[in-house]
């Protein structure tokens, strides 16, 4: 995906292999990338993590020292567009305090792991019927 003039991506075959191996895959991607992944994996769980304010976003980008003024301006110019797509995500986490945000993401992962898919439910129901 082209993000602020740079190209990023995660090899699809790696992701498929990890999923096949039962590994939870976490992708740190922008909105454009997340929507592309969601088309291929609608059953995925999507978490929108955002800072508490634009001012805080600016401070964090500056503190990294990895963005030029031009790149930062371009990035900030897309913030409203990206936030307008927040309803495409399953969860939202405001990263005001890093530890709190990490714990919320962990809680989301744990909750999602507790969900049974239809085939698991069918298997359990069949076992119940066999045991009765």
What are the residue ranges of the model-derived segments?
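Flexible beta-alpha connector loops of hexameric P-loop NTPases
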Residues: 1-5, 61-70
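Conserved catalytic network of the ASCE P-loop NTPase/AAA+ motor domain
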Residues: 17-20, 38-42, 84-86
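Alpha-helical scaffold elements adjacent to nucleotide-binding pockets in ATP/GTP-utilizing enzyme cores
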Residues: 14, 60, 104-107
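NTP-dependent small-molecule kinase module
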Residues: 66, 81-132
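Short phosphate-engaging motifs
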Residues: 33, 53, 100-101
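Ras-like small GTPase catalytic G-domain
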Residues: 42-44, 56, 64-84, 96-100
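ATP-dependent small-molecule kinase phosphotransfer cores
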Residues: 1-25, 31-35
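Conserved phosphate-donor/acceptor-positioning beta-strand/loop module used by diverse small-molecule
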Residues: 25-30, 39-63, 95
